[in-house]
Amino acid sequence: MAMQIKGVIFDFDGTLLDSVELRITAWKKAFQNFGVNVPEDLIRPMIGYPGIDLAKKFVKNPLDVEMLQEDYFLKNIESAKFFQDVIPTLAELRKRGIKTAVVTSTRRIVMQKFSLQVDHVVTIDDVSKGKPDPEPYLKALKMMGIPAEECIVVGDIENDLIPAKKLRCISVLVKHGRDISSNYADYEIENIADILNVIDHLAEKNNR
């Protein structure tokens, strides 16, 4: 797996943005508005999937529910913050000449609320199939102009890592203090800044 890393693709919710709890609350309130009480433990594993897929599991009018939760999320977006090491890490990647992208199941209207210094953004609105299908990653790789083998994918759930493994990207699970692990991860890191250590490690392997 020795190679030079030329790009990093990040998931957004739960990876760069500390927003999972807000997203869960938004879904619960949206379902409740339509008379459906969906427990948190059923919503949480679906965060990161296309919203329409989550809604379809519980209601017959999934688009209406999805749009309502997006509306709640947008109205309360100020409570969601980037993890503290995100901005300096993105700046360091840019300094090193490493291309960056975000691949997210979030809609573009939400992403437009954030000023994020990455080269490319692929939202659920830009593809016909969302994660875990590889399509969003293929689109990002094409935009970045690099092969999958020279790209790292960073995510906080297996839904982010499964398509990365299919494409032979290097998959990295970021924990953010959670006691989690994944068989789909080539590396596991505690925070976003640790991705720089992964890149350095791969560079050392390449020079041996």
UniProtKB/Swiss-Prot annotation:
UniProt keywords, alphabetically: Hydrolase
Annotated TM spans: none
Top-tier EC class: hydrolase
Active site: 11
UniProt entry tagged with the keyword Membrane: no
GO molecular function, one term: phosphoglycolate phosphatase activity
InterPro entries: HAD-like_hydrolase_sf (IPR050155), HAD-like_sf (IPR036412), HAD-SF_hydro_IA (IPR006439), HAD_2 (IPR041492), HAD_sf (IPR023214), PGP-like_dom2 (IPR023198)
Gene Ontology biological-process entries: DNA repair
SUPFAM superfamilies for the chain: HAD-like
E.C. code: 3.1.3.-
Stated family: Belongs to the HAD-like hydrolase superfamily.
Protein's job: Catalyzes the dephosphorylation of the artificial chromogenic substrate p-nitrophenyl phosphate (pNPP).
Official protein name in the record: Phosphatase Ta0845
Organism expressing this protein natively: Thermoplasma acidophilum (strain ATCC 25905 / DSM 1728 / JCM 9062 / NBRC 15155 / AMRC-C165)
